[in-house]
Amino acid sequence: MDGCRARRRARQAIANEQEPIVLEIIDVDFNNPEHGRQVLAMLNEYASGPMGGNTPLPEYAQRNLIPELAKRPTARALLARVDGEAAGVAIYIEGFSTFACRPLVNLHDLGVSPRFQGQGVGKHLLAALEDRARRLGCCKITLEVLEGNAVAQGLYRKQGYEGYALDEHTGRALFWQKKLAV
């Protein structure tokens, strides 16, 4: 990620029941140790929760994730911070739509710290992601969401996301995987 983009910051106020907080959304520089530490902490918190499998990231991922993301020019992230403290993260990867012949962005991970949930952090991360995708000339943003994650599905719907289907006869797309031995 170039330095100019990494220095761009979007500041937004969020209403909290106690007092307004100032949310800062930054483009992550995976070569910045503080950014890397905060992204890893957010992902570990997400992985340790019910929608992440209730297990921290494996030791291998904790040691290697940030350097591996830094090697990949299409891997990017946004970090939401409140007073310098990580409040949320969105990791996204640029892909390509063959049918539209244009780039797309896949939101790979979206996590908000439990301390900041319900305060608009996810909404602001999604808005910032949409802004970045538009700047890249993307035709769409894709994501996967667990069937049982009603809160995330509600957030995505409110932001204009919907299940993917070509038409009613072929049905909705399913997200499949095949794990490969390493």
Label each region the model flagged.
Residues C4-R8, A13-R37, A41, S48, ...:
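Conserved N-terminal entry element of GNAT/NAT acetyltransferase domains
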Residues R102-P114:
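Conserved acetyl-CoA binding element of GNAT-fold acetyltransferases
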Residues E24, F30, M42, G137-V182:
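C-terminal "cap" of GNAT-fold acetyltransferases
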Residues V112, G118-D131, G154, K158:
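Conserved acetyl-CoA-binding loop-helix of GNAT-fold acetyltransferases
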Residues P67-L79, N106:
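A short helix-loop-beta-strand connector motif used in the catalytic cores of GNAT acetyltransferases and
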Residues V82, Y92-F99:
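A conserved beta-strand-loop-helix scaffold within acyl/acetyltransferase catalytic domains
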Residues A75-A90, S113:
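Conserved beta-hairpin
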